[in-house]
Design a protein with these regions (language model features):
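Flexible, glycine/charged-enriched surface loops at secondary-structure junctions
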Residues: 112-114, 142-146, 219-250
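A hydrophobic, small-residue-rich beta->alpha segment in the mid-to-C-terminal subdomain
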Residues: 187-236
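Ferredoxin-like iron-sulfur electron-transfer modules
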Residues: 74-133, 139-147
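Conserved mixed alpha/beta catalytic, RNA-binding, or beta-rich assembly cores of soluble enzyme
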Residues: 133, 137, 142-153, 167-198
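Conserved small/polar residues in nucleotide/adenosyl-binding loops
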Residues: 255-260
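Active-site glycine-rich loop that binds ribose-phosphate moieties when present
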Residues: 28-38, 69-78, 83, 88-91, ...
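Solvent-exposed alpha-helices and their adjacent loops that cap or buttress functional pockets
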Residues: 5-8, 35-45, 59, 74, ...
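An acidic, phosphate/nucleotide-engaging active-site surface
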Residues: 1-64
Length: 266
């Protein structure tokens, strides 16, 4: 979908968790939310880990940076499900038209149409949120306050599982800063101008630096971010200085500018 093949990259492409997503290594992490991360075996077989990240907005995580790329990207299919399993959506029956789009997009058969209304089986649902994106009536919603917080906690602990006890290096590209995740086959125009390439041995420092630069940049006026800011000004609403929170207010992630001590690198 995103063009990662030997023909485009000029090198071999390995699917880290195998052809069916079941080739995984259980990595002890002893986190608060994850005790044993399910990581694609090819990732854990590597002596050195190098990540390359496209920094962008994200409709659930706030922004997609190095930590999200490592934590979610290196998880096996079961690992991805474990990270997504909070904040399961529900259907507002009065708004549902029974079109079945949610059922067709779901890989787990969670949405079921009964009497022309959809209902989501939470025992089957993994909380991936695809059904929210395809509903033509916005009849599906999730408790984002819980799901966003838990998703970010788990991604951080999965990233620790990948990076601990071996040499790591991380590169992040701040270009074509799309409002949504690259998982989608489509996207909107970039919310920010191209900024450049950053690199670090520390994934947390790298994400912080990328967020700092993005929040210092002038938004693209015709983007969803630019329109949200214009709408806030027009209606005399409070305008958040966090560009990613302004793009996706439901993420509940608020940017904290670095202190002078942090900016000096001390």
């Amino acid at each position: 979908m995103n063009g990662f093949s030997p023909y485009q990259t000029g090198c071999h492409v390995l699917i880290a968790d195998g052809l069916k997503g079941t080739d995984e290594t259980l990595v002890p992490v002893n986190g608060e939310y994850v005790k044993e991360a399910k990581i694609g075996s090819a990732i854990m077989d590597a002596d050195v880990f190098i990540s390359l990240t496209h920094f962008k907005g994200h409709e659930t995580a706030g922004f997609g940076g190095t930590i999200k790329n490592i934590g979610m990207g290196c998880g096996s299919r079961a690992g991805k499900m474990e990270q997504h399993c909070e904040g399961k959506p529900s259907v507002a029956t009065e708004a549902c038209i029974g079109c079945g789009a949610c059922g067709r997009i779901c890989a787990h058969g969670a949405p079921v149409i009964t009497d022309h209304k959809a209902k989501i089986d939470h025992d089957k649902c993994v909380g991936c949120g695809r059904c929210l994106a395809v509903c033509p009536k916005d009849a599906i919603s999730a408790d984002y306050a819980d799901s966003v917080a838990m998703l970010n906690y788990k991604m951080a602990e999965y990233s620790l599982a990948v990076c601990q006890n071996r040499p790591c290096f991380h590169v992040s590209l701040i270009c074509d800063v799309s409002p949504n995740c690259d998982c989608h086959p489509e996207n909107d125009i970039p919310i920010l101008p191209n900024i450049g390439m950053l690199a670090s041995f520390d994934p947390v420092a790298l994400d912080q630096a990328c967020a700092d630069l993005c929040n210092q940049a002038t938004p693209v006026e015709s983007s969803v971010l630019g329109k949200n800011i214009a709408h806030a000004h027009e209606h005399h609403e409070e305008c958040d200085h966090d560009h990613f929170h302004m793009t996706h207010p439901d993420t509940c992630l608020l940017y904290t500018s670095p202190s002078p001590r942090d900016q000096r690198g001390s």
